[in-house]
Amino acid sequence: MKILIKYKNIYYTLILIAASLFFPLFYGHKGILPIDSFLIFNGGYNIFNGYYPFKDYWSITGPLLDYIQYFFFIIGKLSWISYVAHAAVFNLILCLFSFYFFLKIELKKEYSFLYALGISILGYGQTGTPFMDQHAFIFSYLSIGFLLLGIKFKKNQYWFFSSFLLIFSFFSKQIPSSYLAIFLFFFSFVYLFFYKKKFANILSFYIGGIFSLFIFATIFVLNKIPFGNFFTQYILYPLTIGDDRFERLSLSINNTVLQFKFLYLAIIPYLAIFYRSRTRK
């Protein structure tokens, strides 16, 4: 029993590794969506055959996923298991980061484990194959996580990785990283106003973003991808899609409340726990 307590984190980590790999690998072989499930597969296949996004084929989705899938095809050959493994690895990253993030902010080990286990199921378990929405969320999630650690511990490396991964999120999908980048831009000035001696934190944040942009700019230059093509396909054209969706947006009770009633109900226990903990203090 003493050994179990001593190595509890190791046991929890091994269980989380197994769970986060199992769910995408299992459900990735259970079914497909005719278009969405093959989108990143085709992108990785194109690069595998010497074609590049924006230059040789039209792309309005994140080019980063195509390149990552290309590397998975190199490592595991051109196969479906290499495709599903892509999703499984990112599910693993999401799960383990969550676990150690919760531990870092001093959440109980048992709670940290259970929350991370739930994340391993909800992460890539729902699709089983790589998709830009999941990747964009994961990178943004990691970015926010590192930012919170940076604020709590005042360490420059956390600030650096926050913006670094935010750029990765943008090149996975334009949102939510664009909204998050705007918010963090203004937040950095507010933070600097209250913590004038922590200029190195903000400097690290911007250096991380610039370094990340430099990596993607280098890829574009090496592959001779025209910037005009990228701007048209990845920035301008998606804006037209957004305009159309915004015009059809309905703010009815059904769309804003009833469709999300179970999410609202799930929040109630957490609010009750939060209220009780505050009253005890």
Model-derived segments and spans:
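Perimembrane helix-loop-helix junctions
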Residues: 2, 179-212, 229, 278
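Hydrophobic alpha-helical membrane-interfacial segments at the cytosolic entry of transmembrane helices
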Residues: 11-20, 196-222, 259-268
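Transmembrane-helix motifs of polytopic, lipid-linked glycan transferases
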Residues: 85-107, 142
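Transmembrane-helix signature of polytopic, membrane-embedded enzymes
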Residues: 98-122, 156-157
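Membrane-interface transmembrane helices that cradle and orient dolichyl/undecaprenyl
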Residues: 104-106, 141-160, 169, 195-197, ...
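Short acidic/glycine- and proline-prone juxtamembrane loop motifs at membrane-interface regions
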Residues: 128-137
